[in-house]
């Protein structure tokens, strides 16, 4: 319980357990713990009518992105068809909210990103990477995610890279990092987050990825 953010923290715990091979269907203490955790996340009270997971526990868009990513990773892992359907339905609703929040009018530098609330008119990298990773995971799992939403989010990350851009869109600074917001200073934490998110999106050979990796090392 991190100051009440039970939904987001439970989602992180579920992903941690899944990453080492545990599943809710496993007939052991780990499987039962995951079943209970997933049942808690799927309570109707945790997701409002908009599809938002971030209001009840105070996690805002951070928590929403984390829970959505977890649900997309848990698709097909429910203990029965009813649970699988609920995971899919709630995940798609959560994805739809992310897509709607991305379309809220922002200035040109902030377009494609997200911030603390679904109606925010600005963006930052730390919130945006969770939404982007959730979108990519959901698309990989067959949910309805326009490719343009992912490419627009990647463009936002590129604008957050601490460098002027050349006419071809590549960074002038070959060795630099990602900032909290476009125009800010490169930071270790945001550079690591931006690097991870871009790789999750398949941008393995991007000069932004190589530049951030070199800067971090």
Question: Which residues are covered by each model-predicted region?
Answer:
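Active-site neighborhood of glycoside hydrolase catalytic domains
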Residues: 156
